[in-house]
Amino acid sequence: MARQPAKVEEMDAWVIRYVNKLKNMMGLSNWTIMMQAKPSSADALGETEVIHGQHLAKMYLHKDFRKDSPEDIRATIVHELLHCHLAVLEEAVHEVLKPDPDDAKSKAVHKMVISLIEYENERIIDSLAESMGKWMPVPDMPKVRVKKKAVKKVVKKQVRSKK
């Protein structure tokens, strides 16, 4: 039996519009942000892979992002877009401290410094996202449709007894 290819869903149009709006407001108008339908890691609200030299980023949101409040979605997307601005720091440090492949000590130092830079970058991005996010618009999310259940009304006739 032939395996069926996995069905790849497209990202919601309202999310793409919102990300494009925010990227322009955040000085990233010359960037291409590719919204990925595949969810981010289970322990993350979002993830972004940045290719700085190409002004390209792939953004992933967690699988249940549609259940988030507009404010939470705004916070996540502002945070992820800030990675586009700051990823160059990690890339520069990585290149400057590129370890000698035969030197275990330089590999260990490289790994430690990169981990420190990544950690501090996340803290900086968290702080910037929190302070500037409140000035950004919230997304125009589709209204949640409530399914109404058909209610069957039973009318009971009152029977009066004759006395």
Q: What does each model-found stretch correspond to?
A:
Residues A2-E71, V88-K163:
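Metalloprotease/metallohydrolase-associated module, dominated by Zn2+-dependent proteases
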